[in-house]
Regions:
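Beta/alpha (TIM)-barrel catalytic core signal, keyed to glycine-rich beta->alpha loops juxtaposed to Asp/Glu
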Residues: 123, 562-563
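Conserved non-cysteine loop/helix-boundary elements of the Radical SAM core domain that shape
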Residues: 43-44
Length: 731
């Protein structure tokens, strides 16, 4: 891999941070604007600052990327996004980092030539998902932080598009894009750039020993920060990261100060250059540089992230104590070296030719006079011309060709310098400028056109069961239109349910890493022959695998496959999916403004707050390869269950914990038992109850209560539920 193919990508939360990143050696900088970025509480850039940053980056031969890596509501997409992006597009913005497939679709159609980078918020975990995004027009994928070097290598071998991966900075406990914890608990959504970081808080933990991971007794209670990870620092394994196929090395930290950006970027710049100069076999990192990185920011030490290990307590800080050492990084302003020729002869204009990287700028001003008294010396002229001030340039060489007996006002010298540099800047920036696309597209005015649908009665009710025992308790109950089951329950329930006319869908893992087990593929073919309807899909990799197999038309998208806006829903409709699930973070009014004709709505369930590659059970109590759980009690005495998913595929011959994940569920279930009349007016196509950590007998009772209300019109019983965002919405 050649040096010019590798990019060091630094963060900037302010213009000062941007200058610090460029000055420290970043090849590219990613920033947030006034809207739609995943760091809403950073200072961020106003329009004028951002336009200036785009030009400054290009003058220095660097790139600037804009984050639009949040989920957008219909009105934001239709009324704001185009006008927000247009000036940056015309100025030459290099790429947009995107999470929302509706945003992806809109930018692809409205801003031709704009590079699209698939954000880590898309949770891209494998080669098929990457290949799918390539086909849709992405030029780069930002990998999930949880991937190993081997997984990244397989992705690189599958697709030619660029791979961007995090090499330094904070680690989220959850897979990025799969965290609702801050949103559900406090209304500040990570999917909107407003995460309050509840994962950094202390919790009292205890083992769960009850059925389905529910607590029946407490053991080894302790209080610490069980979800707080150390920061990642990969300076020692840069050769291995590059060898795996990563082309953009991303530093996290748009919320950090410019000094942090400058310090971290300068160290990675130093060692990248050393790596290409001396080769991987001679690559060594000095102890003082490791200490320097820790002095810049330290949360219980650092780790190399998931690149070389699946998870484990060595990655955990178990506290939120942040330390910095006595370091003061120097903030340097990058200056481009320029060459110039200044021609001064009496009776002719003052002509200045300046060049940078082979590109020229010119100025021709006034008229040079013969000196009446004391002529100007070359030294005096040079001294005046070298006053470049706060420009982006510094002289490497200035040749002055002049008559010995001339006079020219200082004002004219300044004018020549200013005009020549302005001309040079224009020429340097000319290749980046774009014209507005004449095919400008505005989103349909009737977005959410089914908002005032006639009141619907007796919507089909679907049931999802994460546990086989719960499925066996429910599958013969009356009134169930269809079920979403894991593989172990599907084998038992399929034939009986199909014989009674029920739709049957295989629930696939929340996270897909590696290939689908051959055993499961064989059984899927058998189940399809026996009448299985399709699949409940929860991530991009799973969908891409099924699409490749010609099964896209049998996919139901879960709420984690976000469709906040109609453009996103249309994107997936174009992929031929059966239906989507109404997002959990929209309120009633926002759902009403959405096209829900092909949408299923969750009306009951313990909401998954986090999907994590870490394991609370393993980190605190050791791994026993059982799908048990740990309770996390917060400062308000709310108890959350962190459940181990040791065998995501639910097959008999799968290696346990390779890979595994945790699901952290909310403390009380979400339930819209009293909201039937409002839901009837939303125009959704079906309803769902999701059973996860309930005891089987409790699941039966809850189902019958909802069936009585939604099918028989009975009054709802008293039971404690959270309404989630149905009434309030996410910030």
């Amino acid at each position: 891999m050649r040096r010019e193919e590798i990019e060091l990508l630094a963060p900037a939360g302010s213009y000062e941070g941007f200058e610090a990143a460029i000055g420290a050696g970043a090849d590219a900088v990613y920033v947030g604007g006034a809207a739609f970025g995943a760091r809403a509480y950073a200072k961020n850039f106003g329009e004028e600052e951002l336009l200036r940053a785009i030009d400054t980056a290009h003058i220095h031969g660097r790139k600037l990327y804009l984050t639009v890596n949040t989920l957008l509501k219909n009105r934001e997409l239709s009324e704001q996004l185009y006008d927000y992006l247009l000036p940056y597009y015309k100025e030459g913005l290099d790429a947009v980092i995107v999470q929302d497939m509706g945003v992806f679709k809109m930018i692809r159609e409205m801003f031709p030539g704009m590079h699209l980078h698939a954000s880590t918020q898309m949770t891209v975990t494998g080669p098929e998902g990457m290949k799918f995004l390539e086909e849709q027009g992405a030029s780069r994928v930002v990998t999930a932080r949880e991937l190993s070097l081997e997984e990244i290598r397989r992705m690189h071998e599958t697709s030619p598009i660029e791979i961007e991966s995090f090499v330094h900075g904070a680690l989220c406990y959850s897979y990025s894009g799969q965290c609702l914890m801050s949103s559900i608990l406090g209304g500040r959504s990570g999917n909107r750039g407003r995460c309050a970081q509840p994962c950094r808080l202390p919790y009292q933990t205890a083992l769960c020993c009850g059925e389905n991971g529910r607590r029946s007794e407490k053991r080894k209670a302790q209080e610490l920060c069980p979800l707080s990870l150390k920061d990642i620092s990969t300076i020692e394994i840069l050769p291995q990261i590059l060898e795996a196929g990563v082309t953009s090395l991303k530093i996290e930290g748009r919320m950090k100060q410019p000094g942090y950006t400058a310090g971290v970027t300068s160290v990675y710049r130093k060692y990248l250059d050393l790596l290409f100069e001396k080769g991987a076999e001679n690559y060594r990192v000095a102890e003082e540089d490791k200490r320097y990185l820790l002095d810049l920011f330290n949360r219980g030490g650092s780790c190399t992230g998931y690149y070389q290990m699946q998870n484990g307590p060595s990655m955990m800080a178990f506290s939120n104590e942040k330390k910095t050492g006595d370091v003061s990084p120097v903030l340097r302003k990058k200056k481009e070296k320029i060459q110039g020729t200044f021609i001064l002869f009496p009776g002719s204009p003052a002509i200045l030719d300046v060049s940078c990287r082979g590109i020229h700028g010119f100025a021709s001003v006034g008229e040079v006079q013969y000196a009446q008294n004391q002529p100007l010396t070359e030294e005096r002229i040079r001294s005046q011309m070298e006053k470049l001030g706060n420009t982006e340039y510094e002289w490497e060489n200035l040749e002055i060709q002049m008559d010995e007996n001339i006079f020219i006002p200082m004002k004219m010298l300044n004018e020549a310098r200013r005009e020549a540099l302005e001309s040079l800047g224009n020429e340097l920036l000319k290749p980046y400028k774009r014209e507005e696309n004449n095919g400008k597209k505005r989103l349909s005015e009737d977005a959410g056109r089914k908002a005032d649908s006639p009141k619907q009665k007796n919507l089909p009710i679907y049931i999802s069961c994460e546990e086989k025992s719960t499925a066996l308790a429910l599958y013969k109950r009356e009134g169930i239109h269809g079920m979403y089951l894991n593989a172990d329950a599907m084998e038992v329930c399929l034939d009986d349910c199909v014989s009674r006319g029920m739709e049957m869908y295989l629930s696939l893992p929340h996270i897909m890493r590696g290939e689908m087990p051959r055993e499961l593929l064989t059984r899927i073919r058998e189940w399809m022959d026996r009448g299985m309807t399709g699949f409940l899909v929860r991530n991009l990799e799973t969908f891409a695998v099924l699409r490749k197999a010609g099964l896209a038309e049998k996919c139901v998208l879960d709420h984690s496959m976000y469709t906040w806006n109609d453009e996103a829903a249309d994107f997936w409709k174009d992929q031929k999916v059966l239906r989507n699930t109404v997002p959990l973070e929209l309120n009633e009014g926002e759902i009403r403004h959405r096209d829900n004709r092909d949408s299923e709505m969750l009306i009951y369930g313990y909401l998954p707050l986090m999907i994590s590659a870490q394991c609370v059970h393993k980190n605190l109590y050791g791994c026993n390869h059982k799908e048990e759980g740990v309770t996390l009690k917060d400062r308000y005495d709310k108890e959350f269950t962190a459940k181990c998913i040791c065998n995501p595929w639910k097959t008999e011959n799968t290696d346990f914990c390779i890979p595994c994940y945790n699901i952290i569920y909310n403390s009380i279930p979400y339930g819209l038992l009293k909201e039937k009349s409002q839901i009837d007016r939303l125009g959704v196509s079906s309803l769902r109850l999701a059973f996860t950590i309930e005891k089987p007998q409790d699941a039966v009772k809850i189902y019958e209560e909802f069936r009585a209300v939604y099918r028989d019109g009975k009054n709802p019983p008293k039971r404690e539920y959270t309404k989630g965002h149905f009434k309030r919405g996410a910030e």
